[in-house]
C-alpha cells in the first residue's frame, strides 16, 4: 500500500474482513491481549446499554466493520439498529451473518459471554435472533462527508455508536473534529454519542497489511467532542493494549456524550 495515512481506496482494495475477524475476534481461543480487550469492551457496552440508561428507539452504528459484538447489548435497549460501513466487503460480511449464510463468522462464543453478563435471561441463539430482527438496514457510510449516510432519508437517531472506527477513518485531528460534527447531523438533540477507540496508536496490522491509525490522546478526544457540539458524561480509559505484533496503541477509551440542544 501507499506511504502516508491509509486512504479510503486502500481500505476498499486491501481490507480483508475474514482476516480481521480471525485476528481480533477469535474469542476464547487463546488468552491473548485481543481476547482481553474484547472482554473489556463487551463489559463496557453492557454497562452503557443495560445499566446506565442509554436507550431509545433508533441506534445508528457508525463504521460497524464486519463485526456485531458492539450491538449485542445495544439490541436490548433500542428497538431498531442501523449498521453502517465504508467498505463493500464489510457490508457483505455483515449481511452474511444477518442472513445466516454459509461461511459467516461464528460469533456464538461472544454471544454466550454477553448472555452471561446480562444474567442468562436468554440463550445465545435467542440473542442472535433478537439482534438480527433489530438490525433493519445495512448502509454505506463515509464520516468525512457532510452527510455521512448520503441522501438516505432517516429519522434522527437516539444514539450514535462508533467502535474502533474514527481512528482509522481520520488522518488528522481537524478531520476527526469535522467527522464528529458531520455525525451530529444524524442525532436528535439530547441524543447519545458512544465512542470506543484506541489511544496513542499510529497503526494496526491485519496479517501483513498495515493500516494507519490517528494517534489520539484523552485531552484531544474530549476537546474534539466538545467542539463538535456534544457534552461529555463519562470517559473511561482501558489500560489493556493490543499485542505488539498487532498494534502500537497505549490502551483504549470509552466515552458517553450527548448532543447539545440548540440555544433558544
From Swiss-Prot:
PTM annotation: Deiminated by PADI1 and PADI2.
- Keywords, in A-Z order: Citrullination, Cytoplasm, Methyltransferase, S-adenosyl-L-methionine, Transferase
The entry's S-adenosyl-L-methionine-binding residues are 20, 25, 63, 69, 85, 90, 142-143, 163
Note whether S-adenosyl-L-methionine occurs among the keywords.
yes
Q: Give a yes or no for keyword Transferase in this entry.
A: yes
Similarity field? Belongs to the class I-like SAM-binding methyltransferase superfamily. NNMT/PNMT/TEMT family.
Q: What is the protein named?
A: Nicotinamide N-methyltransferase
Q: Which organism is it from?
A: Sus scrofa (Pig)
Amino acid at each position: 500500500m501507499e506511504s502516508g495515512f491509509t486512504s479510503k481506496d486502500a481500505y476498499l482494495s486491501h481490507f480483508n474482513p475474514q482476516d480481521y475477524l480471525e485476528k481480533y475476534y477469535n474469542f476464547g481461543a487463546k488468552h491473548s491481549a485481543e481476547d482481553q480487550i474484547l472482554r473489556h469492551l463487551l463489559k463496557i457496552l453492557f454497562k452503557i446499554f443495560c445499566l446506565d440508561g442509554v436507550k431509545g428507539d433508533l441506534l445508528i452504528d457508525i463504521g460497524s466493520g464486519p463485526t456485531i459484538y458492539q450491538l449485542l447489548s445495544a439490541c436490548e435497549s433500542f428497538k431498531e439498529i442501523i449498521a453502517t460501513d465504508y467498505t463493500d466487503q464489510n457490508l457483505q460480511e455483515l449481511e452474511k451473518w444477518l442472513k445466516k449464510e454459509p461461511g459467516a463468522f461464528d460469533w456464538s462464543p461472544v454471544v454466550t459471554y454477553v448472555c452471561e453478563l446480562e444474567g442468562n435471561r436468554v440463550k445465545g441463539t435467542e440473542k442472535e435472533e433478537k439482534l438480527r430482527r433489530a438490525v433493519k438496514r445495512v448502509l454505506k457510510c463515509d464520516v468525512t462527508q457532510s452527510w455521512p449516510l448520503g441522501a438516505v432519508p432517516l429519522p434522527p437517531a437516539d444514539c450514535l455508536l462508533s467502535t474502533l472506527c474514527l481512528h482509522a477513518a481520520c488522518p488528522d485531528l481537524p478531520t476527526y473534529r469535522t467527522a464528529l460534527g458531520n455525525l451530529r447531523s444524524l442525532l436528535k438533540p439530547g441524543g447519545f454519542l458512544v465512542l470506543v477507540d484506541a489511544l496513542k496508536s499510529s497503526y494496526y496490522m491485519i496479517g501483513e497489511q498495515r493500516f494507519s491509525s490517528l494517534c489520539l490522546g484523552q485531552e484531544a478526544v474530549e476537546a474534539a467532542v466538545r467542539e463538535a457540539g456534544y457534552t461529555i458524561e463519562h470517559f473511561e480509559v482501558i489500560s489493556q493494549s493490543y499485542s505488539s505484533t498487532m498494534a502500537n496503541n497505549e490502551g483504549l477509551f470509552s466515552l458517553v456524550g450527548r448532543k447539545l440542544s440548540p440555544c433558544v
